[in-house]
Curated annotation (Swiss-Prot):
<feature type="modified residue" description="Phosphoserine">
    <location>
        <position position="26"/>
    </location>
</feature>
<dbReference type="GO" id="GO:0030032">
    <property type="term" value="P:lamellipodium assembly"/>
</dbReference>
<dbReference type="GO" id="GO:0051489">
    <property type="term" value="P:regulation of filopodium assembly"/>
</dbReference>
<dbReference type="Pfam" id="PF02209">
    <property type="entry name" value="VHP"/>
</dbReference>
<dbReference type="GO" id="GO:0051017">
    <property type="term" value="P:actin filament bundle assembly"/>
</dbReference>
<feature type="compositionally biased region" description="Low complexity">
    <location>
        <begin position="11"/>
        <end position="29"/>
    </location>
</feature>
<feature type="compositionally biased region" description="Polar residues">
    <location>
        <begin position="276"/>
        <end position="322"/>
    </location>
</feature>
<feature type="compositionally biased region" description="Acidic residues">
    <location>
        <begin position="216"/>
        <end position="227"/>
    </location>
</feature>
<dbReference type="GO" id="GO:0030863">
    <property type="term" value="C:cortical cytoskeleton"/>
</dbReference>
<dbReference type="GO" id="GO:0005829">
    <property type="term" value="C:cytosol"/>
</dbReference>
<feature type="region of interest" description="Disordered">
    <location>
        <begin position="79"/>
        <end position="158"/>
    </location>
</feature>
<comment type="subunit">
    <text>Monomeric (isoform 2); under reducing conditions. Self-associates. Exists under oxidizing condition as a trimer of two isoforms 2 and isoform 1 linked by disulfide bonds. Found in a complex with DMTN, F-actin and spectrin. Found in a complex with ADD2, DMTN and SLC2A1. Interacts with F-actin, ITPKB, RASGRF2 and spectrin. Isoform 2 interacts with SLC2A1 (via C-terminus cytoplasmic region). Isoform 1 and isoform 2 interact (phosphorylated form) with plasmodium berghei 14-3-3 protein; the interaction occurs in a PKA-dependent manner.</text>
</comment>
<dbReference type="GO" id="GO:0051563">
    <property type="term" value="P:smooth endoplasmic reticulum calcium ion homeostasis"/>
</dbReference>
<comment type="function">
    <text>Membrane-cytoskeleton-associated protein with F-actin-binding activity that induces F-actin bundles formation and stabilization. Its F-actin-bundling activity is reversibly regulated upon its phosphorylation by the cAMP-dependent protein kinase A (PKA). Binds to the erythrocyte membrane glucose transporter-1 SLC2A1/GLUT1, and hence stabilizes and attaches the spectrin-actin network to the erythrocytic plasma membrane. Plays a role in maintaining the functional integrity of PKA-activated erythrocyte shape and the membrane mechanical properties.</text>
</comment>
<dbReference type="GO" id="GO:0015629">
    <property type="term" value="C:actin cytoskeleton"/>
</dbReference>
<feature type="modified residue" description="Phosphoserine">
    <location>
        <position position="156"/>
    </location>
</feature>
<feature type="modified residue" description="Phosphoserine">
    <location>
        <position position="315"/>
    </location>
</feature>
Length: 405
């Protein structure tokens, strides 16, 4: 009892350490006062956890401080007790014993402790978000769903049925939006809306093309109707030009009249210039009328390398460069228009001693093509057809031996 008399009075539910213990802060020196009973450490530990001993929600997070105790006023304000238990220890010096003795008494607040609690309230920086509760509509979780809000606004059964029908109809479309009636319909699947099929796209394209054709025909009819207006404008131009005497005035008036004329966009009357409509015989007949450039009386033997098809070699009219327009060189995408000249072998030989001057217009990479059939068979000991069937490295080796590479 003496031990308890030495200790100051504490509020119910508070823990205070004993100062008489030989080992300060040991568990055996801790006593608690609860319901007008003094409990030791062992009795305090035997009480079940679900009973609020210290009137704190999380007693396991409370930090044990042997020199300070919590008063009842601090336990009343739950957010402050949470901040104090979860925040680190403050570095401010402890208050005087008189202030603590006055603050520990239940229901009595001294003048020394009053300014501490009322005048300078304890504030700490918030480390969490406080939602705005000034407006009742700010919290979206407390609001009813949209269709229920509409029911509260207009609670008639007709509007309720309309809203339900709208919800059901919108659930049938992707993104709850009806499709555009002007666009082709998409393929409907159970997984994801696919793009429209090619058949639907093709029909839509044909419809648009037909409408464009109709618009073009209308424009052509308008152009035909405006032909008379064009004639009238030209007659006016001639009359105005006949009135002007100076040449400079005539030029200026002519330019102004040409700018004022409407531009005709009729292009269907133009002939087709595509290569699919021109024939090979028409091109050869035109080329035969041109003056012969470098033609010789020697007849070249057409090989598979120099001609795209073997049918040209059998026809006599395609020899001697007449069918060169249709010939395709190997490795080139464009046809060889100009006929290659034929030179003797001695003029085409390339030596390493000095820089040899080749004839003009000679292809340095294909000197063998400028040889005649007799010189070709004499130099390479084979026909041009057999030479064209060889591999590239083999042909280069033969040309090196013949000094044509």
């Amino acid at each position: 009892m003496e031990r308890l008399q030495k200790q100051p009075l504490t509020s119910p539910g508070s823990v205070s350490p004993s100062r008489d213990s030989s080992v300060p802060g040991s568990p055996s020196s801790i006593v608690a006062k609860m319901d007008n009973q003094v409990l030791g450490y062992k009795d305090l530990a035997a009480i079940p956890k679900d009973k609020a001993i210290l009137d704190i929600e999380r007693p396991d997070l409370m930090i044990y401080e042997p020199h300070f105790t919590y008063s009842l006023l601090e336990h009343v304000e739950l957010p402050r007790s949470r901040e104090r238990s979860l925040s680190p220890k403050s570095t401010s010096p402890p208050p005087s014993p008189e202030v603590w003795a006055d603050s520990r008494s239940p229901g009595i607040i001294s003048q020394a402790s009053a300014p501490r609690t009322t005048g300078t309230p304890r504030t700490s920086l918030p480390h969490f978000h406080h939602p705005e509760t000034s407006r009742p509509d700010s919290n979206i979780y407390k609001k009813p769903p949209i269709y229920k809000q509409r029911e509260s606004v207009g609670g008639s059964p007709q509007t309720k049925h309309l809203i339900e029908d709208l919800i059901i109809e919108s659930s049938k479309f992707p993104a709850a939006q009806p499709p555009d009636p002007n666009q082709p319909a998409k393929i409907e699947t159970d997984y994801w809306p696919c793009p429209p099929s090619l058949a639907v796209v093709e029909t839509e394209w044909r419809k648009r093309k037909a409408s464009r054709r109709g618009a073009e025909e209308e424009e052509e009819e308008e152009d035909d109707d405006s032909g008379e207006e064009m004639k009238a404008l030209r007659e006016r131009q001639r009359e105005e030009l006949s009135k002007v005497t100076s040449n400079l005035g005539k030029m200026i008036l002519k330019e102004e009249m040409e700018k004022s004329l409407p531009i005709r966009r009729k292009t269907r009357s133009l002939p087709d210039r595509t290569p699919f409509h021109t024939s090979l015989h028409q091109g050869t007949s035109k080329s035969s009328s041109l003056p012969a450039y470098g033609r010789t009386t020697l007849s070249r033997l057409q090989s598979t390398e120099f001609s795209p098809s073997g049918s040209e070699t059998g026809s006599p009219g395609l020899q001697n460069g007449e069918g060169q327009r249709g010939r395709m060189d190997r490795g080139n995408s464009l046809p060889c228009v100009l006929e290659q000249k034929i030179y003797p072998y001695e003029m085409l030989v390339v030596t390493n001693k000095g820089r040899t001057k080749l004839p003009p217009g000679v292809d340095r990479m294909r000197l063998e093509r400028h040889l005649s059939a007799e010189d070709f068979s004499r130099v390479f000991a084979m026909s041009p057809e057999e030479f064209g069937k060889l591999a590239l490295w083999k042909r280069n080796e033969l040309k090196k031996k013949a000094s044509l590479f």
